[in-house]
Amino acid sequence: MKTKILSVVVMFLLGTMNLLAQSKTEKFKVFGNCGMCEKTIEKAALSVDGVKSADWNKETKMIEVTFSESKTNMDKVHIAIAKVGYDTEMHKAKDEVYNKLPGCCKYDRPE
């Protein structure tokens, strides 16, 4: 009986550890300026299936993203953010999308 209980507890703990191991948090730079940028950038990141949280800091221009490695990857997050007009370290937004951003959201684009 003790062996069965111990087996169930061990399986539960291993399952929990496996779920925790699948979550990963990464930071990367996203260009933007204001609170409106923050909302749009975070919403774009959160639209990616598997992203659990996204927090962009307008002072540092860094976003912290927690995601499930079994459902997505960072490239998909970069692409989603670039599609709404914001350049990231890996992907540049299309000029026509960037040009549609409100004036307060336009930033000096890196070459």
Language model features by range: what are they?
Residues M1-T25:
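Bacterial Sec-dependent N-terminal signal peptides
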Residues N99-E111:
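Short, low-order "capping/linker" segments at domain edges
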Residues K29-E64:
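N-terminal targeting signals for Sec/Tat export/insertion, comprising classic cleavable signal peptides
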Residues G85-V97:
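Conserved short beta-strand edge segments in small beta-sheet-based binding/regulatory domains
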Residues S68-M74:
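Helix N-cap motif at beta-to-alpha junctions
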Residues I41-K43, K76-V84:
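Short amphipathic alpha-helices in soluble, non-transmembrane regions
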Residues K58-T66, E96-P102:
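Surface-exposed aromatic
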Residues S23-F31, Y98:
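Immediate flanking context of iron-sulfur cluster ligation sites
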